[in-house]
Structures are given as C-alpha cells and as structure tokens.
C-alpha cells in the first residue's frame, strides 16, 4: 500500500471520529497528501466515505449511490454546480466543501440529495448562492457557512423546517437594514437557527464591530426616522467597552434640508450627532437649548435659512460642546461676540464655524470685537473670506472683508469724515502761528543782546 494511501486512511479515521465536523486543528482539507494539482479521490467502502482533492471525476460518480459522506477539498473552479456534481448521490448524508476558491453556487442542490443532513461549505470565497439553493434538502439539519465571503444573505434560503443549526462567523457581512432578520426572536425563525450570531461581525463601514447591536441600532434608527420628514443614516460607531448596544456609541446623521421647514424639528432619532437643515425658512435656534432630543447634536448645518440672532445660545451648554456650526447665508447682522469668544476658548470639541454670506454690521460698536474674534480664531472660522460688511450704497465699507478693515475705516463714518479736514487745517494754522510767535521772541532777544536796543515794535509800545 502506498504511503499516500496510508496517510489518507489515517485522516479518514480522524474524520469519522469527529463525526460532527472538523476542527481547525485536524481538518483533512489542509493536509493534502497529493503534491500536484491533479484530481485524486479515495473511497472507503466500509464507511461509504469518498474524499476528493482538486475536483471530482466522472469515474467516481459511478459509485455515487453508495456514498454517504463526501468531502471535496480544493475545488478547482470558481463556480460549484450542485445539480451537476451531486447528481446520483442519492444516499448522501454529509457533504463538506472546504479550502477552495469557489465563489458561487450556480444552482440549487438536486432532489437526489434530499437525505443530506449535514452541509459544510467553509474557508472558500463563496459570496453568493441562489435563494432556493437548499430548498430540495428537506432533511438538512446542520448548515455550516463559516469563513467565506458572504456579504448579504437572503433569509429565504434558510426556510426549511428541518434546519436547526446555522453557522455564519467569518463572513464580511454588511450591517444594513436588510440584515434586520437576525433580530427576529420568534421560535423557528432564521435568526433562532443561527448558533453563532453573537459572534458575527460587520464589514465596511463598521469593520470589526459586533453585528447584532449595530443592526439593532440601524433598525431603531429606521423606525424613529419615520416620525420625521428627514433622511437618516448611521454614520459610524465606536466601542465604549464590551460589545453590547449599551456600550456602543453611535453617531447618526439626520438630513432635513430643503423641506420648507419654518422651525427646527420637534423630534430627532436617538444618537443624532449631525443635523442638516440647509435651505429652509427657520428663524429660531431655541430648541438647541430647550429640547432634550438635541442633546447629542454636535454638527449643525443651518446655512441658507432666516436666522437673525444667536442670542438664545448665549451661556448654553450646547454652545460649549458643539463641533460644527454652519450659519452661512442667514439674516445675521451681529452676534454676542463675548459669548462666542468664551465658547471657542473653552470648547475643546469645536472644529468649524461658518458665518459667511450674512449682512454684517460694520460700525465702531460691534465690528472691532468681531474682527478680533475672526482673526484670533481664523483656524476655526472656515469661510473668513466670505465674512463681509453688508452690501449698501451709502457706506464706503460695503461688501469689504471684515478681517482686512482698519480701525480708521471701521470707526470714522462719512459724516465724521467731512468735519475732519477743516479741523485738521485749523489745527495746523494755529500751530504755525505759535511757532512764528516763538521765533519772533527769539529774534527780539538776540537783537537786544547784540545791540542793546529794543526792537522797533517794542519802542513803539513804550
């Protein structure tokens, strides 16, 4: 007997001993006794056990009706056609396909495999199979699909009464609302059959996060979003501890832009961190300070609305913890610079402030402190070049960048300017007369010292 055959028989007994499947330690498909890529099979008649590497030749299908256990290692094709490959395997009870590059089951399993109880397709590149792939397997009780490339699963594929145990770990599953079937608690549901659902992990964009709590958050967000006129999306999540929903911090984005709203929404879904209200007709920002649903809002896009004042935010907790505030294109003419300055100094979260395209007042009362704020926090004010004086016909500063104004331009009005030059001329004339008088005094003193005579004007006075 050849060494290869002895080696293979040893592994047959290992497999029989672990009749419920392989462990990673002793999986026979990772111990190929054949050093080349030729198709080779061996059959243990006493156990009705057939194992094949690199494909299944037709010559072995002649013995198919006697095979109860079939192992296919290193399947050479990217597609696996169950209908064609398994035709004639009428006694098959257990099928394993492992350590292969197959990507697709191209057909459903044939009716001849109706007695198949244990199906294991593991460590392949399988990413898709028909929704009726297992519909003919009325005896199937154990389905192992671990360590494949499955991103989405059609839950209808698991709709068999006999099926009791499903394994799915090691697949890059997408965590979307389409995966909400995994939350179904009802007995007999597909979810109740997934043995390892607590170990399932999400793929992009929530790489490595636990699937169950993420899908639960997404499902809850979808339901709560129905109470608004907005679009809602889970942006990202971070783990705050063990992988349970209560220990995952979620960040959701709610987009209510261009909805013709006249006030901020009364209700927001849980975990709303980004709120977009662009292009509405909102005037009042009070809900940021009074409505508890806004507690988690960090990024607020309020551009192109009708906001005239942010005075309501002065001294509020929200102003001390916001991350982004966009007030471009509103009706602002001024703001409480001291309150905003204080918030920017003490808020370690703030990353962006947008104030451009508003009709800002440019006068000596408001603008100097506002200009100082803009220059001091130019790294946070992202649209500083668009922050300009109101566009008017009677102001020399009309539409000028506030950052670049001089104090003279800010604090001297046109009316004041008309009085400035006459007074200046008068001051110059008076100063000149003083210098002339002082010069005449010095001359007279010098003349007296030289001649001992008083100047003529002094004689006349005497």
Residue ranges and their predicted role:
Residues 2-462:
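Extracellular leucine-rich repeat
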